[in-house]
Swiss-Prot record:
Peptidoglycan polymerase that catalyzes glycan chain elongation from lipid-linked precursors. InterPro entries: Glyco_trans_51 (IPR001264), Lysozyme-like_dom_sf (IPR023346), PBP_transglycosylase (IPR036950), Pep_trsgly (IPR011812). GO terms for cellular component: peptidoglycan-based cell wall; plasma membrane. HAMAP family: PGT_MtgA (MF_00766). Pfam families: Transgly (PF00912). Its main location: membrane. SUPFAM superfamilies: Lysozyme-like. One of its GO terms (biological process) is regulation of cell shape. Belongs to the glycosyltransferase 51 family. The lineage of its organism: Bacteria, Pseudomonadati, Bacteroidota, Bacteroidia, Bacteroidales. The gene is mtgA. It catalyses: [GlcNAc-(1->4)-Mur2Ac(oyl-L-Ala-gamma-D-Glu-L-Lys-D-Ala-D-Ala)](n)-di-trans,octa-cis-undecaprenyl diphosphate + beta-D-GlcNAc-(1->4)-Mur2Ac(oyl-L-Ala-gamma-D-Glu-L-Lys-D-Ala-D-Ala)-di-trans,octa-cis-undecaprenyl diphosphate = [GlcNAc-(1->4)-Mur2Ac(oyl-L-Ala-gamma-D-Glu-L-Lys-D-Ala-D-Ala)](n+1)-di-trans,octa-cis-undecaprenyl diphosphate + di-trans,octa-cis-undecaprenyl diphosphate + H(+). GO terms for molecular function: pentosyltransferase activity; peptidoglycan glycosyltransferase activity. This is Biosynthetic peptidoglycan transglycosylase.
Length: 248
């Protein structure tokens, strides 16, 4: 009986592996379009790191829906992290070009990751930077932009991002940093939270340094310049649709 050549077996395994990868990742993205994200790889990694260093693992995280988060917070992170979030398709090529030009002249490199890219990384990938992870990040960013709405991306981002040592998401940050709820965060508190995001372990929004307070003022000013999110027009259309359904 003729046996298939090893190369054919390898190709068949590779094909099956690719099919499994695409099917499982697309399914995961579709599931998370509707389901709250309670655990992320970063949460697990941070807990393991704390255990390895002899510390007690700290894991503070409570999922809340987008309408239970202060409207100032999405505005603050857009102003701070990604002012074209509502316009781009996951990648801000204007910022990428700017970063490339700036990085030619400076030692400390700056990134141009969008909120969509950060969400893809937070939910599906590991934090350590590498070309492999960047490749997967591009792939997952494409998928969430395809299957999720911008509001859903922002909802997941604000619920999953690291905002302090062992603190993840808006609700936990509001409780443990400001003794309030995510819905009641003020514009100033939201600007402080956004100011810590480049390094939430180093910066503490509850005890802001002079640098953090300066950055807070910058973000508050920028919040008045970026477009409202979600767009006012979209919210008005959603309300009209709801009223029509009730009448029927």
């Amino acid at each position: 009986m003729h046996r298939p050549l090893p190369i054919k077996k390898i190709l068949r395994y590779a094909r099956n592996l690719l099919i499994f990868f695409f099917a499982s990742t697309i399914l995961a993205v579709i599931v998370y379009r509707f389901m709250p994200v309670y655990v992320t790889p970063l949460m697990v990694i941070r807990s393991v790191q704390q255990l390895a260093s002899g510390d007690k693992p700290t894991w503070k995280h409570t999922w809340v829906s987008f309408d239970k988060i202060s409207p100032h917070l999405p505005m603050a992170v857009i102003a701070s992290e990604d002012n074209r979030f509502a316009e781009h398709n996951g990648f801000d090529f204007i910022e990428i070009e700017k970063a490339m030009k700036e990085n030619e002249k400076r030692k400390r490199k700056r990134g141009a990751s969008t909120i969509s890219q950060q969400t893809a990384k937070n939910v599906f990938l590991w934090p350590q930077s590498s070309w492999v992870r960047k490749g997967f990040e591009v792939y997952f960013t494409f998928l969430i932009e395809l299957f999720w709405s911008k509001e859903r991306i922002m909802e997941v981002y604000l619920n999953s991002i690291e905002m302090g040592k062992g603190i993840y998401g808006a609700q936990a940050t509001a409780k443990y940093k400001f003794n309030t709820t995510a819905a009641k965060l003020s514009s100033g508190q939201c600007a402080l939270i956004a100011a810590t995001l480049p390094n939430p372990i180093r910066f503490n929004s509850a005890k802001p340094s002079a640098y953090l307070l300066k950055r807070q003022k910058q973000i508050l000013r920028l919040m008045n310049l970026v477009p409202k999110f979600p767009p006012v027009e979209k919210k008005a259309v959603d309300k009209k649709d709801t009223r029509k359904k009730k009448k029927k």
